[in-house]
């Protein structure tokens, strides 16, 4: 979705496996508290990987929902502050409605739904709970559909492009020239 819609390619770092914890009693995360996990993830990724060795970090849990710092890639103290949690973290709803949504905040995207749930007046351009990635499809009435479609609204693409071109996240992206 990010590559197709926003021309952003993400690559896993070679030492990603060092950030996978199999023992809940020894891992550094508070599974059911996304707010606390934001700081825990920043500290953990920086300590294990090193701040200079990655541009964006995101942690997954089996807790509920998600939370992320806005415009955080490339920012040394915020770039790993993204959390996505769901009791059953599998399938398209998890990948699109939660992971792509929370990473959308990290890249600079605000909510697009026009209802009473987490509304952002400047980007509330979709009816009801919205239907694109940065909306709340199926989460908060009036629901237009049960899950998000797998694309960004143009208003979010503009926000993301502005952030990675001119904003906080512009400092670490590499432009690749294409023959297109």
Question: Which role does the model predict for each range below?
Answer:
Residues 1-180:
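Extracellular (secreted or membrane-anchored) zinc-dependent metallopeptidases
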């Amino acid at each position: 979705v990010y590559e197709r819609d926003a021309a952003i390619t993400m690559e896993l770092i070679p030492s990603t496996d060092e950030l996978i914890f199999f023992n809940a009693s020894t891992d550094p995360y508070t599974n059911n508290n996304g707010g606390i996990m934001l700081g825990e993830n920043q500290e953990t990724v920086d300590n294990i990987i090193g701040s200079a060795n990655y541009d964006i970090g995101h942690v997954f849990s089996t807790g509920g929902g998600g939370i992320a710092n806005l415009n955080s890639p490339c920012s040394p103290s915020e770039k790993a502050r993204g959390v996505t949690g769901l009791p059953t973290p599998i399938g398209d709803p998890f990948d699109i409605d939660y992971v792509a949504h929370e990473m959308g905040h990290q890249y600079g995207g605000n909510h697009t739904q026009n209802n009473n749930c987490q509304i952002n007046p400047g980007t509330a351009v979709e009816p009801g709970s919205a239907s694109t990635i940065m909306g709340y499809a199926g989460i908060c009435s009036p629901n237009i559909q049960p899950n998000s479609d797998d694309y960004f609204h143009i208003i979010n693409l503009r926000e993301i492009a502005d952030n990675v071109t001119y904003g906080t996240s512009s400092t670490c992206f590499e432009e690749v020239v294409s023959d297109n």
